[in-house]
């Protein structure tokens, strides 16, 4: 339940269009106006995933800090990790504005941003200047006008290898024409071979192997999920992120905004993304790391992702409605839920509802 102060702050921000409000929130984080979250570390939330140790399982999803402007400020809000990007080799302006739409009744967001970002060099410069050593992932993509999109992903691996703790290859945004075609089995095999070969080459030269995750769409057929699982396993991919935004508009109250093109995120994405997460967990088995994202708005929904098969979870859109204190609320809430469950580690609860979610019709 949103408290009166948060409600007032939200009302003020909502006087501005969503993209302007987003820019204001970045500026506030840069200036230090947003207070840091004081969390007591809970060893039950700490776990090692893909060879990396996370202090807690909650991350900020890609899309908020596209240009690596505030990664350390985000970590101070209580996130155990954050993911910058999506970044493309060359700067690009994205699609025409307006391109972000709030669905207030649904607590959802539709965006058709189109990978707007300042390019590799700008983001790299900011990350290289950091001294904190926080858990910061880099989400890489392809330029809209690229003649060789796979080469763009390889370029991302090479450019950010010295500053990334992990990589995410984003092939599932619905806002770059043809990008989701890379999820097809033949294209995916070529992409994974190229990206992982670049990672292995850079790893051999540097002495450190950086994990690579693949971010997939929720709008996959059963065959599509089969293909992605098979290629992920055969290429020894380090993990999956499930899922990106959806093109579906099922069950929305705000039918006026629902007509806008773009990807839907926030609360309306929770059930669909969680069902796809569980189906992918059943396909890839217990060992491949999965980050669950889509509609996480509370400790309860974060834990439900974990019960459905996620090792870690991410959020973004729900912070639009709940404010910057959401991360701390979720992490503290997870500790309370572990108390209730009498669990010694959050890992004990993973997969406990995977069958339920895999069977959900969405």
UniProtKB/Swiss-Prot annotation:
Q: Where does FMN bind?
A: 62-66, 86, 139, 170, 215, 243, 266, 295, 316-317
How many cofactors are bound and how? Binds 1 FMN per subunit.
Listed pathway(s) = Pyrimidine metabolism; UMP biosynthesis via de novo pathway; orotate from (S)-dihydroorotate (quinone route): step 1/1
**Compartments reported by the entry:** Cell membrane
The keyword Membrane is annotated on this UniProt entry: yes
Q: Which reaction does it catalyse?
A: (S)-dihydroorotate + a quinone = orotate + a quinol
Which prosthetic group or cofactor does it need?
Answer: FMN
Question: Where does the sequence pass through the membrane?
Answer: none
Main EC class of this protein? oxidoreductase
Give the family from UniProt: Belongs to the dihydroorotate dehydrogenase family. Type 2 subfamily.
The record describes its quaternary structure and partners as: Monomer.
Write the protein's name: Dihydroorotate dehydrogenase (quinone)
Organism annotation: Rhizobium johnstonii (strain DSM 114642 / LMG 32736 / 3841) (Rhizobium leguminosarum bv. viciae)
């Amino acid at each position: 339940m949103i408290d009166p102060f948060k409600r007032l702050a939200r009302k003020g921000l909502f006087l501005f269009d969503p993209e302007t409000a987003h820019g204001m929130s970045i500026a506030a984080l840069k200036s230090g106006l947003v207070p840091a979250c004081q969390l007591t570390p809970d060893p039950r939330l700490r776990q090692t995933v893909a060879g990396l140790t996370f202090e807690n399982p909650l991350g900020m999803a890609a899309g908020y800090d596209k240009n690596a402007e505030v990664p350390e400020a985000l970590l101070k809000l209580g996130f155990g990790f954050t993911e910058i990007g999506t970044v493309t080799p060359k700067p690009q302006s994205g699609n025409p504005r307006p391109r972000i739409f709030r669905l207030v009744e649904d607590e959802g967001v539709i965006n058709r941003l189109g990978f707007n970002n300042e390019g590799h060099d700008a983001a790299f410069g900011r990350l290289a200047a950091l001294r904190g050593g926080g858990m910061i992932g880099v989400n890489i993509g392809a330029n809209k006008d690229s003649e060789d999109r796979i080469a763009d992903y390889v370029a991302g691996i090479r450019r950010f290898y010295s500053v990334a703790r992990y990589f995410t290859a984003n092939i599932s945004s619905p806002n770059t024409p043809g990008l989701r075609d890379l999820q097809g089995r033949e294209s995916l095999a070529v992409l994974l071979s190229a990206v992982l070969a670049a990672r292995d080459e850079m790893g051999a030269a540097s002495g450190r192997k950086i994990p690579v995750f693949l971010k997939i769409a929720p709008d996959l057929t059963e065959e599509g999920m089969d293909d992605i699982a098979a290629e992920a396993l055969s290429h020894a991919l380090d993990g999956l992120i499930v899922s990106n935004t959806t093109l579906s508009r099922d069950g929305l109250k705000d039918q006026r905004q629902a007509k806008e093109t773009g990807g839907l995120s926030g609360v309306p994405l929770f059930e669909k993304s969680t069902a796809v997460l569980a189906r992918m967990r059943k396909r890839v088995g217990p060992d491949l790391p999965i980050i669950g994202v889509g509609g996480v708005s509370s400790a309860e929904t974060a834990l439900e992702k974990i019960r459905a098969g996620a090792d870690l979870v991410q959020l973004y859109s729900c912070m639009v409605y709940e404010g910057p204190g959401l991360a701390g609320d979720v992490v503290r809430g997870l500790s309370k839920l572990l108390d209730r469950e009498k669990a010694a580690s959050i890992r004990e609860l993973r997969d406990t509802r995977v069958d339920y979610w895999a069977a959900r019709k969405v």
